Amino acid sequence: MIKAIIGLGNPGEKYKNTRHNVGFMVADLVAKSLNCDRKYREKAFSHIFECPDYDVIIAKPQTYMNLSGNAVLNILKDYKIKPSEILVVYDDLDLPLGAVRLRLKGSSGGHNGIKSIINTIKTEEFPRLKIGIGRPEKKEEVSDYVLSPFTKEEKFLLDKVLAHANECILNVLKYGIEKSMNMCNKNLV
């Protein structure tokens, strides 16, 4: 049973609409869908939305992406949650924009936020929802790319992806991870 949905991103207005903040975007949408307490609380280095009707919290770590593990560890401790009871939502360069993948566990795949979580909580055994953002043409452009906003053309598809990710998470909360995989794992292009 999932007890915390953790959307990864970078805090601050500067990063609000960037590719790296897809996790935050999904977290906001889910919090709205579940009618969570909109007055987030600063706890565990995160903005926490409490959703008492669903016995789940939505967290947006405020540690910056590369230090996400610190926030996740504090969430686990403060809320007495096991790694298997969190769902981490984040951007994935290796998936095209429009792809969504739900996984029970796995490696970091080179994602620094996930790497930080794995290194800090000492396990890869936590569920995650990967949101494809595509990859830039040149490898040296990766950091600029993930910190750039979506183009006007991409925004149309992004809205569909965010809606699908929201539905996926609602499904996970209702039916669990394994029963939700077929519904969640899609390419929307």
Swiss-Prot record:
Domain of life, per lineage: Bacteria
**Keywords assigned by UniProt?**
Cytoplasm, Hydrolase, RNA-binding, tRNA-binding
Q: Name one GO cellular component term.
A: cytoplasm
Instruction: Provide the active-site residues from the annotation.
Output: 20
Where would you find this protein in the cell?
Cytoplasm
Residues that coordinate or bind tRNA: 15, 64, 66, 112
Q: What is its EC number?
A: 3.1.1.29
Respond yes or no to whether keyword Nucleotidyltransferase is given for this record. no
Which InterPro entries does UniProt cross-reference here?
Pept_tRNA_hydro, Pept_tRNA_hydro_CS, Pept_tRNA_hydro_sf
- Residues the record annotates as the site (Discriminates between blocked and unblocked aminoacyl-tRNA) are 10
Q: List the disulfide bonds.
A: none
Question: Which residue ranges traverse the bilayer?
Answer: none
Q: Site Stabilizes the basic form of H active site to accept a proton: which residues?
A: 91
User: Could you tell me one molecular function GO term of this UniProt entry?
Assistant: tRNA binding
* Gene Ontology biological process terms from the UniProt entry: protein quality control for misfolded or incompletely synthesized proteins; rescue of stalled ribosome
The catalytic activity, as recorded, is: an N-acyl-L-alpha-aminoacyl-tRNA + H2O = an N-acyl-L-amino acid + a tRNA + H(+)
**Family, as annotated:** Belongs to the PTH family.
Function text? Hydrolyzes ribosome-free peptidyl-tRNAs (with 1 or more amino acids incorporated), which drop off the ribosome during protein synthesis, or as a result of ribosome stalling.
Quaternary assembly:
Monomer.
What is the protein name given in its UniProt record?
Peptidyl-tRNA hydrolase
